[in-house]
């Protein structure tokens, strides 16, 4: 039967509960245990699919097509276990399910209340389908004291009494701020946070304290005394030079030992952390460096590209080089020559996105990469802009554009329903729902034999990758584009939807309709990112 570890946060948000959960999961996994990680999000949205990247950051898509919190990306990268839609739930989804049941009459006329109906739904989600796992780690989003989080805290309080004694522990992630004028770390915010947690019936077993310096013995003693935890359970979570150094750092601080002790489990063997050590050695001692320009529209919010950043670092790990990122707002190129911004870089990546803002700048970035032989990686929207660039500047289709931006005489890119219905432009109503209208999750793609991408994937002819898009490249223009050198080297197995384009006579120019960054791991870098960084490394030696 699974044991449960609940991770809560206090004092301030954005302390890294997701990363802490992922690192602890990796440590338990390294000891031979089977782990599952889940995330409870207290916001009222059904999912983050329609939320602004500036507010929520990246939307992480699972194989089964769920749009989830970016923390699930950390879970996958650290444990290697693919997440599913059953690993993330929001208040909005819970209320939707409850109200659907109420309208259906499932509650037999009962008054629907937060306790017990909402809390029971949360508990049912937490314990569902956990057979075969030794530990289930459950992260509660937000901080203690947030009004929207109260039903979740009440549910995890109740669940300790529902399960056998000793099967549940609570870890509280908190902040120890350093006050320069006083010259000391302050424990009072943590004390108040734990007091708030205890007021709703939850006593933390372990305090995980974020800090930028060692915790003095006196402060550790004070935290243990006033927060009612063992002194050994006050764990120092120092800032690390890389997120992949966190598992080793947490082990050195005693987190996994303290977790096992809280469950009364004897720690017979230390965790096998050799591969983590090897990864960190490569990160700390690179044999070179490459600079990649990311030409996007959310560059002011790096969390919008979290998986992309990590996938590029994985490509660097595979090639033993440091990957430096040059963030460029694509709108800049609409009024300025891209050359001064891009001449010094070793590779250009145009990531996914939605909407017209900055689109012309991305097209100019693709043109610069094509004409100057700079490695180019276009992902989703980045592939579509590369196709439009080829249509305009190689095939002579001057009005080539996307129907996403409005009516166009030459719809190189449009809604999938448009092309599947014989190019009769059929558009979703502007008043319609945005949620649930995309191609989401893992889909297969057939690769052309002998193509560059086929070789990158290891000479395979079929792959499976995760998608998140409404628009597709129009296959009616496929032959004209191929006549001018843009090869459609990957298609859906039925030949209807373009998946990959490339230039054979370019050092490295690939556009993909899917999101390969979502499947990259530090120990298994995605082959496209490894190859892209390798091409950038070759470019760096030529410039």
From Swiss-Prot:
Assigned EC number: 6.3.4.2
UniProt-annotated stretches for the region Amidoligase domain: 1-265
Binding-site residues, Mg(2+): 71, 139
Binding site for CTP: 13, 146-148, 186-191, 222
Binding sites annotated in the UniProt record for ATP: 14-19, 71, 238-240
Enzyme superclass (EC): ligase
Pfam family, one: GATase
Assigned keywords, A-Z: ATP-binding, Glutamine amidotransferase, Ligase, Magnesium, Metal-binding, Nucleotide-binding, Pyrimidine biosynthesis
Residue ranges annotated for the Glutamine amidotransferase type-1 domain, each copy included: 291-542
One cellular component term from this protein's GO annotations in UniProt: cytosol
InterPro entries listed in its UniProt record: Class_I_gatase-like, CTP_synthase, CTP_synthase_N, GATASE, GATase1_CTP_Synthase, P-loop_NTPase
Positions that bind L-glutamine: 54, 353, 381-384, 404, 470
Role this protein plays: Catalyzes the ATP-dependent amination of UTP to CTP with either L-glutamine or ammonia as the source of nitrogen. Regulates intracellular CTP levels through interactions with the four ribonucleotide triphosphates.
Quaternary structure (record): Homotetramer.
Family listed: Belongs to the CTP synthase family.
Protein name: CTP synthase
Lineage: Bacteria, Pseudomonadati, Pseudomonadota, Alphaproteobacteria, Hyphomicrobiales
């Amino acid at each position: 039967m699974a044991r449960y570890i609940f991770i809560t946060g206090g004092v301030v948000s954005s302390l890294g509960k997701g990363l802490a959960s992922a690192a602890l999961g990796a440590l338990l996994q390294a000891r031979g245990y089977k782990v599952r990680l889940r995330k409870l999000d207290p916001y009222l949205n059904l999912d983050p699919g329609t939320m602004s990247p500036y507010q929520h950051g990246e939307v992480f898509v699972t194989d089964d097509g769920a749009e989830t919190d970016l923390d699930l990306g950390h879970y996958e990268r650290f444990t290697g276990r693919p997440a599913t839609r059953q690993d993330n739930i929001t208040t909005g989804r819970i209320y939707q399910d409850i109200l659907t049941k109420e309208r259906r009459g499932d509650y037999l006329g009962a008054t629907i209340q937060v306790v017990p109906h909402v809390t029971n739904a949360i508990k049912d989600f937490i314990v569902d389908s956990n057979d075969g796992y030794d530990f289930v780690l459950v992260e509660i989003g937000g901080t203690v004291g947030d009004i929207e989080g109260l039903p979740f805290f009440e549910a995890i309080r109740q669940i300790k009494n529902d399960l056998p004694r000793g099967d549940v522990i609570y870890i509280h992630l908190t902040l120890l701020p350093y006050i320069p004028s006083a010259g000391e770390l302050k424990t009072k915010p943590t004390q108040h946070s734990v007091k708030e947690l205890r007021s709703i019936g939850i006593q933390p077993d372990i305090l995980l304290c974020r800090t930028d310096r060692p915790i003095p013995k006196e402060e550790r003693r004070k935290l243990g005394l006033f927060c009612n935890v063992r002194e050994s359970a006050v764990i120092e979570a120092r800032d690390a030079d890389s997120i992949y150094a966190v598992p080793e750092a947490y082990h050195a601080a005693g987190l996994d030992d303290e977790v096992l002790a809280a469950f009364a489990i004897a720690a017979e063997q230390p965790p096998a952390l050799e591969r983590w050590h090897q990864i960190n050695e490569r990160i700390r001692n690179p044999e070179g460096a490459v600079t990649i320009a990311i030409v996007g529209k959310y560059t002011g919010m790096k969390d919008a590209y979290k998986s992309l950043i990590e996938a590029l670092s994985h490509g660097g790990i595979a090639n033993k080089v440091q990957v430096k990122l040059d963030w460029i707002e694509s709108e800049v190129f609409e009024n300025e020559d891209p050359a001064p911004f891009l001449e010094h870089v070793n590779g250009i990546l145009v990531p996914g996105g939605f909407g017209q803002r900055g689109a012309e700048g991305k097209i100019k970035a693709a043109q610069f990469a094509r004409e100057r032989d700079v490695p180019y990686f276009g992902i989703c929207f980045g592939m579509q802009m590369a196709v439009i660039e080829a249509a305009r500047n190689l095939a002579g289709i001057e009005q080539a554009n996307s129907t996403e931006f409005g009516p166009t005489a030459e719809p190189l890119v449009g809604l999938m329903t448009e092309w599947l219905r014989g190019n009769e432009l059929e558009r979703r109503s502007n008043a319609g729902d945005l949620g649930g209208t995309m191609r989401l999750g893992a889909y297969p793609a057939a690769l052309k034999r002998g193509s560059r991408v086929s070789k990158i994937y290891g000479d395979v002819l079929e792959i499976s990758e995760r998608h998140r898009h409404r628009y597709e490249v129009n296959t009616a223009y496929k032959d004209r584009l191929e006549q001018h050198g843009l090869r459609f080297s990957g298609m859906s197995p039925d030949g209807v939807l373009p998946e990959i384009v490339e230039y054979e006579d370019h050092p490295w120019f690939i556009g993909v309709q899917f999101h390969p960054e979502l499947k990259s791991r530090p120990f298994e870098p995605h082959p496209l990112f490894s190859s892209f960084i390798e091409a950038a490394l070759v470019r760096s030696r030529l410039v």
